[in-house]
Amino acid sequence: MKKVLTLLLMFGLSFAAFAQMVDPVKFNSKLEMLKGDEAQIVFTGKIDNGWHVYSTDLGNDGPISATFNAVKMDGVKTVGKLTPKGHEISEFDNMFGMKLRFFEGSVTFVQKIKFTKPTYSINCYLEYGACNDETCMPPTEVPFTAEGKSPAVSEEAASESPKEVAQAPAAEEE
């Protein structure tokens, strides 16, 4: 009977430990309007001590790079690449055998967008990798969704085709 109780207790404790998975990075996301017909999707992360989040464009042979992934973007298009902001650390990593770029403490990733229609619907996510000195988390997604009226795109501008310009007749030679 003691063995069964001990086994059940160990199973219960291991289940409780599994339920409290490590979440060393907490992200917030928001849409910031810029001038005219542009905006930016901002992902801001707070990183626990001892952990780091990898930067963008690290290549295929290393850890998971931070990437912007569009599920559905209607009425907007991306402008440029995902841009990391913060104090980026660059150093050789023995575990991966390569020079890596990462952030500790905090990081912000920004994706600029441009509105193309009078209304928009955005469904996207940031994917990132995080490690400490002993382990790495599986690739993690930070979802972002938003919809609304575009700030600087009118119905006319969105549907208007370029106007044909009449050419002036050539001057006659005398």
Task: Name each model-derived stretch.
Residues 4-17:
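Sec-dependent N-terminal signal peptides
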Residues 18-174:
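Extracellular/lumen-exposed scaffold segments
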